[in-house]
UniProtKB/Swiss-Prot annotation:
Entry's pH dependence statement: Optimum pH is 8.0.
Activity regulation field: Inhibited by CuCl(2) and ZnCl(2).
Positions that bind Zn(2+): D30, H80, H84
Name of the featured protein: Peptidoglycan-N-acetylglucosamine deacetylase BC_3618
Gene Ontology molecular function: hydrolase activity, acting on carbon-nitrogen (but not peptide) bonds; metal ion binding
UniProt temperature dependence: Optimum temperature is 37 degrees Celsius.
Cofactor(s), by name: Zn(2+)
Organism: Bacillus cereus (strain ATCC 14579 / DSM 31 / CCUG 7414 / JCM 2152 / NBRC 15305 / NCIMB 9373 / NCTC 2599 / NRRL B-3711)
Pfam families documented for this protein: Polysacc_deac_1
Disulfide bond sites: none
Role: Catalyzes the deacetylation of N-acetylglucosamine (GlcNAc) residues in peptidoglycan. Also acts on soluble chitin substrates and N-acetylchitooligomers. Acts on cell wall peptidoglycan from the Gram-positive bacteria B.cereus and B.subtilis and the Gram-negative bacterium H.pylori. Not active on acetylated xylan.
C-alpha cells in the first residue's frame, strides 16, 4: 500500500483541507440503503447540511431512486467502486475494472465532480494510477474523524469522537449502508445540532476542495 507521505504531495489524494472558515464535510460510505439513507437525508434537510455520499455501484442498481433523491436534495455522490473490492486482497486487474466499471455506471447520474474513495481507504499503485488517469480526485478522510461507526461502537462513542475532534476543514467518515446503521443515524441526530451550535457549516467535499492550496 502507498503511504500518505507518498500520496499527499501528488495533489490527487485528500484527507482534509484545513482553513479558517468553520466548515466540515460529512461523508457517507457503502450506500445507498433503502432503510438508512432516507433517514440520513431527513436529518441533513432538518439542519440544512450538505453531504457527500460515496456509493457502491451494485447497491445503486438495487436502489436507483435513492441516487435521484440524494442529488435532488443538493448533495453529491462519489464512486466507491462497483463491487467494493479491497486493494489489500484483489488483483490489479480486478481493482482497475472495479473502479472503471463504477465510473461508467455513475456517469449516468453525474458528470462532475469526479470524486473517488477506495474501499477501506486502501491505495496501491494500481488504484492510484487508475483513479488518476480516470480524472478522479481521491478523497479519504481526516485520520481523527473515523469514529468506526461501521463497528457499531455505541451512539455516544460516535458522537463524542466526531464532536470532540472537530476542526475546520475536516472530512468525517460515516456509513449509511452495508449493515445496521441505526447507531450512525442516531449519532448524526446529535452531531449536526452540536456542531451547528459551535458555528460549523456542513459542505460537500467539492466545496471543501475549493479551499485547497
Amino acid at each position: 500500500m502507498l503511504l500518505r507521505k507518498e500520496l499527499e504531495p501528488t495533489g490527487y489524494v485528500t484527507w482534509e483541507v484545513p482553513n479558517n472558515e468553520k466548515i466540515i464535510a460529512i461523508t457517507f460510505d457503502d450506500g445507498p440503503d433503502p432503510t438508512y439513507t432516507p433517514q440520513v437525508l431527513d436529518l441533513l434537510r432538518q439542519y440544512k447540511a450538505e453531504a457527500t455520499f460515496f456509493m457502491i455501484g451494485f447497491r445503486v442498481q438495487r436502489n436507483p431512486y435513492l441516487v435521484k433523491q440524494v442529488l435532488k436534495e443538493g448533495h453529491e455522490i462519489g464512486n466507491h467502486t462497483m463491487n467494493h473490492l479491497y486493494a489489500s486482497n484483489s488483483s490489479d486487474e480486478k481493482l482497475e475494472n472495479d473502479i472503471l466499471d463504477g465510473k461508467k455506471f455513475f456517469e449516468k447520474w453525474v458528470k462532475e465532480p469526479l470524486l473517488f474513495r477506495p474501499p477501506g481507504g486502501y491505495i496501491n499503485d494500481a488504484v492510484f494510477k487508475t483513479a488518476k488517469e480516470a480524472g478522479y480526485q481521491t478523497v479519504l478522510w481526516s485520520w481523527h474523524q473515523d469514529p468506526r461507526d461501521w463497528a457499531n461502537p455505541g451512539v455516544e462513542s460516535i458522537v463524542n469522537h466526531v464532536v470532540k475532534n472537530a476542526k475546520s476543514g475536516d472530512i468525517v467518515l460515516l456509513h449509511d449502508g452495508g449493515n445496521d446503521r441505526s447507531q450512525t443515524v442516531a449519532a448524526l441526530a446529535k452531531i449536526l445540532p452540536e456542531l451547528k451550535k459551535q458555528g460549523y457549516r456542513f459542505v460537500t467535499v467539492s466545496e471543501l476542495l475549493r479551499y485547497k492550496h
